């Protein structure tokens, strides 16, 4: 599965509604609510899709934990912080915000809505969201 910053992951695109996601990926293995969104979990794909209530119940955020997923053409899940940041820095000219949460370290590229979560020096999750035209207006692909 390929991750497309600002667009989506694989065949699903930001801006699609829940039924469109289900039509493409099938029924989710688990559904729960979190922080103003409905979360659809797909165990085999190892992704968590967020349907955001504040944005007309559209797909606006995804968490990817699949080790076969690619970002900028490379498989990065499980790789070291140094390697991942090197690959990302070569592809984009942005400096991330850094947050140390103990065993979890987060690098967030706000202008790209790209979040990299590391645990024990290894990338555990690549999270991306829809880009915004302004503070409240999503730029749907």
Regions found by a protein language model. Give the residues of each.
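Short helix/turn-capping signatures at newly exposed starts of structured segments
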Residues: 1-141
């Amino acid at each position: 599965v390929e991750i497309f910053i600002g667009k989506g992951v694989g065949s699903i695109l930001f801006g699609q509604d829940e039924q469109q996601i289900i039509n493409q990926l099938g029924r989710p293995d688990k559904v729960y609510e979190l922080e103003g969104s409905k979360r659809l979990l797909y165990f085999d794909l190892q992704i968590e899709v967020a349907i955001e209530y504040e944005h007309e119940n559209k797909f606006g955020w995804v968490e990817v934990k699949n080790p076969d997923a690619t970002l900028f053409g490379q498989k990065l899940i499980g790789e070291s912080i140094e390697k991942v940041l090197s690959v990302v820095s070569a592809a984009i000219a942005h400096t991330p915000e850094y947050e140390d949460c103990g065993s979890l370290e987060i690098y967030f590229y706000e202008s790209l809505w790209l979040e990299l979560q590391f645990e024990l020096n290894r990338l555990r999750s690549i999270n991306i969201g829809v880009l915004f035209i302004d503070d409240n207006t999503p730029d749907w692909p």
